[in-house]
């Protein structure tokens, strides 16, 4: 590669193309490929690099706690999970249809791992996603009420293609927090998908969200376009013999 060409690629921020140029040129000369095929190979390498960088950026923004993967989930240790059903969810048809997914089960059965694995699949397919623990979400809602930034918070969360709310359970909530959560779910209703992991059945949501009529309306929206998966199996956190 000439110094001029290297500088041009550097100025254009075509890092990957600059890194593979000599290798691809040598391979092209040996294989006697056409100029267009050679250029296509360079552009393809640059494109893949951009895609990988964009994915890493989206993953960082999504706040995934760990790089959970559906491929590495210990299905053999969790008979309560229907692997075929999870594979169907991994096709992301529920995201395309703006449907919700609620994973219900005791602590440690793998709800978060499966949910994060599905969120990663969505990220890999270019969707805007975010992971948030329920306690952190409600804390953020309370802080937004204090500084009058609720509308900004709702706008940010409502436009996400997939919002994963983890550990949705008994929390000490003020009525204003419950109201804000209802508004969020109302704005996401049949527009975007929400994944919720919880150890509570739907009949227990009234106990911590408060206002019965509001919770009934919330459940109507959450469950209308929704897949509910109940995981009844052993804890994956138990020591392995």
Q: Where do the protein language model's features map onto the residues?
A:
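Interdomain "pre-motor" coupling segment immediately N-terminal to P-loop NTPase/helicase cores
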Residues: 10, 14-65
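Conserved adenine-nucleotide phosphate-binding loops and their immediately adjacent elements
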Residues: 62-74
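Walker B motif beta-strand of ABC-family P-loop ATPases
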Residues: 162
